[in-house]
């Protein structure tokens, strides 16, 4: 198991945790002093009140919670958000309201999930042409024959 160092910015912060043995992500909670309202079509940056030290060769991905998306149209604007291993600031989440109603966020509401992922660095090699494949240059919808 990989160790992730985490710092609370306030004593009353609830740390992320896996809700089940099979969970891939840990829920992130909103660290807001008062209710935040997100109007339809609006985006807001929401604090979590935590900072982390991610081990080298890992990243954290911030992803939407499926329940918020399905029930309220709430998503993350830059999904998945990437937190690099050398970042040491507070984790914040850019929420967007794609729904039709005003959405309210209160302190400790679960707003996103955090997934720790290994990364693989690659060495780029510029070439004049690429190897051929059956698919070739077929793009969007090209495999729906």
Regions found by a protein language model. Name each.
Residues 1-145:
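DUTPase catalytic domain/fold
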